[in-house]
């Protein structure tokens, strides 16, 4: 983690910058309280000074460290010239949708100079989640780990000597607000300069012969370490390896997994993967590497992004005897198959007290097939008659079932829903299937041409989907090759979903339903839909409110690969969305300025 020393005076008066646990008696639940001061800071990397946005003078930001059952209270003070919200990524927010922190979906941004208190409970979840800004591209630097520890202190795996967040991100020299504006206008020529591990660029990056600082993990031979690997990047999925070591994957997205041994972890934007690493190598220095993968040409290409850190054994000397330090052998950056096979090998692990929560709904009330890809809308208000195929007459947008989400910059959708005022704001007719079937994974559709041009026209609208309380919903996400062949990390706020199966090619219900895992599927809040493939998920709508569904590639969400699910109230007050809490500021009092 990079601490910015020039911020010291700013925080001299902030006494609540670290967690305050109150009234913990006999293992009872506590109130864990923190203050997030959000501000600008100048940081120098690669011989250039860049203005970034941080919390409490740190990049990444402070860790929220709680125990299952605790109440979390975070006071956010916005010293930025832009509005922002904080999203608690993966927290179920049972009956606390008002605290989800999705900008313009559950709340309006905290205006410059404003404050907001988030208050919610973390019941029934254990493991690694994270938090991040949820307005524009600010999450690139406004983010941090969110750790939920078991109430009884016991794990279904050997207790590690230490646990360490490994936060993979990206270093952007361009101002993040300007980056957002460019992408909104269809300009995707900007790229990060480097990957980062816990805010460090690593010694592969240098300027004028001066190498960048690397993240260093100190270990003692014979001990095990729980690495909480989180991908906060805007653009890329990452491969992560440590030379001379193997991992045992034990959890993901705040849920336990059946232990799975591997020498490499793949983590997509939005995901959090828990792995045990046993320090059993000869004492020395070993490189850890985070390498971004990307589809091969003809997809648009970005520069290779890599960050390199170190695992340093106690007693190991940095001298000529252990140089060069061992390097892990990484896959080719264009080989995305290791990502697919890594996820196919993961299964869920339900503890005895979790059996009910881990029971897959046997029946299905609603089925959706959602295609994920690119399309275009005409510039200048011309709705249909414009030249397609990456023409300057069009803006390229991201779509779900040929609908590109029209992001609002006015009153939050949750307020409209709660007040019963959706007219003229949103409709509830998000399509349950694409408007017309085609060969979704035909690589001939990647380059612009007449084949894909006929499929480009897209509706720009705010079309949501409503579900009754306690309905069983099955979604098949289908990646397409329209103008690109990216994977798609799909994140559903307020829910964990059972990942029943993943596959390559076009989903075929006659063939692929037989592959569904009803016995021990993963529970995830972010599902990586493979490049040129599909993922099938199922969940029970047991959490009333307005819940954002979107791809976690930032360029996809800005381009419109999103919608929201409305879950109706249940039959009792305990199964209904409560009124907004006293600390919730309605949009009229919270500021409406779009950053």
Curated annotation (Swiss-Prot):
Localization (cell): Secreted, Extracellular space, Apoplast
A Pfam short name: Cu-oxidase_2
Entry EC number(s): 1.10.3.2
Amino acids binding Cu cation 2: 89, 132, 552
Sites where a glycan is attached: 42, 48, 121, 206, 345, 382, 402, 409, 439, 470
Cofactor details (free text): Binds 4 Cu cations per monomer.
Name of the encoding gene: LAC18
Gene Ontology biological-process annotations: lignin catabolic process
Cross-referenced SUPFAM superfamilies: Cupredoxins
Signal peptide annotation: 1-29
Reactions catalysed: 4 hydroquinone + O2 = 4 benzosemiquinone + 2 H2O
Domain Plastocyanin-like: 37-153, 162-316, 429-571
Protein name: Putative laccase-18
Function: Lignin degradation and detoxification of lignin-derived products.
Family: Belongs to the multicopper oxidase family.
An example Gene Ontology CC term for this record: apoplast
Entry-linked InterPro entries: Cu-oxidase-like_N, Cu-oxidase_2nd, Cu-oxidase_C, Cu-oxidase_fam, Cu_oxidase_CS, Cu_oxidase_Cu_BS, Cupredoxin, CuRO_1_LCC
The organism's place on the tree of life at top rank: Eukaryota
PANTHER family: LACCASE-18, MULTI-COPPER OXIDASE
Main localization, broad class: secreted
């Amino acid at each position: 983690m990079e601490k910015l020393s020039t911020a010291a005076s700013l925080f001299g008066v902030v006494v609540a910058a670290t967690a305050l646990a109150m009234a913990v008696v006999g293992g009872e639940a506590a109130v864990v309280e923190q203050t997030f001061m959000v501000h600008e800071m100048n940081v120098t990397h690669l011989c250039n000074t860049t203005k970034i946005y941080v919390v409490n003078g740190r990049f990444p930001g402070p860790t929220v460290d709680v125990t299952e059952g605790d109440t979390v209270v975070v006071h956010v003070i916005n010293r930025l010239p832009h509005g922002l919200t904080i999203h608690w990524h993966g927290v179920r927010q049972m009956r606390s949708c008002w605290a989800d922190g999705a900008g313009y979906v559950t709340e309006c941004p905290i205006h410059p100079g404003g404050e907001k208190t988030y208050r919610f409970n973390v019941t029934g979840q254990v493991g690694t989640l994270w938090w991040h800004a949820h307005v524009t591209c600010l999450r690139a630097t406004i983010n941090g780990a969110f750790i939920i520890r078991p109430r009884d202190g016991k794990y279904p795996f050997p207790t590690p000597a230490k646990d360490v967040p490994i936060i993979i991100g990206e270093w952007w020299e361009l101002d993040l607000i300007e980056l957002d504006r460019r992408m909104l206008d269809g300009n995707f020529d900007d790229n990060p300069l480097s990957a980062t591990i816990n805010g460090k660029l690593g010694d592969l990056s240098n300027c004028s012969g001066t190498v960048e600082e690397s993240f260093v993990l100190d270990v003692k031979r014979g001990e095990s370490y729980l690495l909480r690997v989180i991908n906060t990047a805007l653009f890329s999925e990452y491969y992560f390896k440590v030379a001379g070591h193997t991992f045992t994957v034990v959890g993901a997205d705040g849920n336990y997994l059946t232990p799975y041994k591997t020498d490499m972890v793949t983590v997509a934007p939005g995901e959090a993967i828990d792995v045990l690493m046993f320090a059993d190598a000869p004492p020395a220095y070993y490189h850890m590497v985070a390498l971004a993968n990307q589809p091969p040409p003809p997809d648009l290409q970005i520069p290779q992004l890599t960050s390199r850190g170190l695992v340093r054994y106690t007693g190991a000397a940095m001298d000529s005897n252990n140089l060069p330090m061992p390097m892990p052998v990484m896959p080719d950056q264009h080989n995305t198959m290791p990502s697919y096979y890594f996820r196919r090998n993961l299964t869920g692990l339900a503890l005895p007290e979790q059996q009910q929560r881990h029971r897959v709904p046997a029946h299905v009330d609603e089925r959706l097939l959602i295609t994920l890809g690119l399309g275009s809308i005409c510039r200048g208000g011309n709705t249909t008659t414009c030249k397609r195929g990456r023409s300057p007459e069009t803006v390229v947008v991201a779509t779900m079932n040929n609908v590109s989400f029209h992001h609002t910059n006015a009153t939050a959708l949750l307020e409209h829903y709660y007040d019963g005022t959706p007219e003229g704001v949103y409709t509830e007719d998000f399509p349950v299937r694409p408007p017309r079937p085609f060969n979704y994974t035909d690589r001939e559709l990647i380059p612009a041409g007449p084949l894909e041009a006929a499929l480009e026209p897209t509706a720009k609208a705010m079309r949501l989907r409503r579900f009754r309380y306690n309905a069983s919903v099955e979604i098949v996400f289908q990646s397409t090759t329209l103008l690109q062949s990216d994977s798609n990390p799909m994140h559903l706020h307020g829910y964990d979903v059972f990942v029943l199966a993943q596959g390559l090619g076009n989903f075929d219900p006659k063939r692929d339903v037989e592959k569904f895992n009803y016995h021990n599927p993963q529970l995830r809040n972010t599902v990586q839909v493979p490049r040129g493939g599909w993922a099938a998920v199922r969940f029970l709508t047991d959490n009333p409110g307005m819940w954002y569904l979107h791809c976690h590639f930032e360029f996809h969400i800005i381009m419109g690969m999103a919608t929201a699910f409305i879950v109706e109230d249940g039959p009792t007050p305990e199964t209904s969305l409560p009124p907004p809490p006293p600390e919730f500021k309605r949009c009229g009092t919270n500021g409406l300025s779009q950053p």
